[in-house]
Amino acid sequence: MVKSTTVTRLDGLPLAASVDDESTERNLESHKKQAKLILKRLSPTSEKRASIESGDYTFHYLIDNGICYLCICEQSYPRKLAFSYLEELAGEFWNSFGEEALQPGLRPYAFVQFDTFMQKSKRVYNTPRANDNLDKLNTELKDVTRVMTKNIEDLLYRGDSLEKMADLSSDLRYSSAKYKKAARRVNLEALWRQYGPVSIIALLFLIFVYWRFFA
């Protein structure tokens, strides 16, 4: 499952973060500290996508337009879904706030209202139906097994770098448009499966009421 999410500029300014319940805050206390250390290591030359393993959890991050989207997931959570989730957040955040998020003088967490979208997306990606869509992701999205993977000890305590590898970066840029389109379609299908039947029933009820009392 996706447990927690942060949105941070590459200069270190936090823009938004998911509001997590007390249990999640307690269980992820040390991992959130590690997340802050990871974010401090990032720069414009860092790998644009990476996964960093730490015990029972994995950090996945995506850098887009000078902004880093980072989520903490259970180690068993499919990497493809994690990056699809981050792509969805990146697209929505940039469409909603754009270059406003890059302006100087912003206060920390200036876009706290983005938590509403993060929570909705997290619920969708944490449903069993999301895992059912993995077959589509397998054929339509970039092979994320090639995404840089690090161990938290190697990164924070042994001096490993998150600087990008040229061949991997070019491959990721080449597939970015296809990845984003496929991820959005999978998310829309998951939303339809979750809310479509209720919407149809509500529409039929309204038609019946109109026909019964106003026709």
From Swiss-Prot:
GO MF annotations for this entry?
Answer: SNAP receptor activity
Q: Where is the Longin domain positioned along the sequence?
A: 9-118
TM helices/strands, residue ranges: 195-215
* Keywords annotated in UniProt: Coiled coil, Endoplasmic reticulum, ER-Golgi transport, Golgi apparatus, Membrane, Protein transport, Transmembrane, Transmembrane helix, Transport
User: What compartments host this protein?
Assistant: Membrane; Endoplasmic reticulum membrane; Golgi apparatus membrane
Q: Which InterPro entries match?
A: Longin-like_dom_sf (IPR011012), Longin_dom (IPR010908), Sec22 (IPR044565), V_SNARE_CC (IPR042855)
Q: What happens when the gene is disrupted?
A: Leads to sensitivity to thiabendazole, camptothecin, DNA damaging agents, and microtubule depolymerizing drugs.
Q: Which GO terms describe its cellular component?
A: endoplasmic reticulum membrane; ER to Golgi transport vesicle membrane; Golgi membrane; SNARE complex
Report the sequence similarity comment from the record: Belongs to the synaptobrevin family.
Summary of the function given for this chain in its UniProt record: Nonessential SNARE involved in targeting and fusion of ER-derived transport vesicles with the Golgi complex as well as Golgi-derived retrograde transport vesicles with the ER.
Q: Which PANTHER family match?
A: VESICLE-TRAFFICKING PROTEIN SEC22B
- Recorded protein name is Protein transport protein sec22
Q: Which organism is it from?
A: Schizosaccharomyces pombe (strain 972 / ATCC 24843) (Fission yeast)
Source taxonomy: Eukaryota, Fungi, Dikarya, Ascomycota, Taphrinomycotina
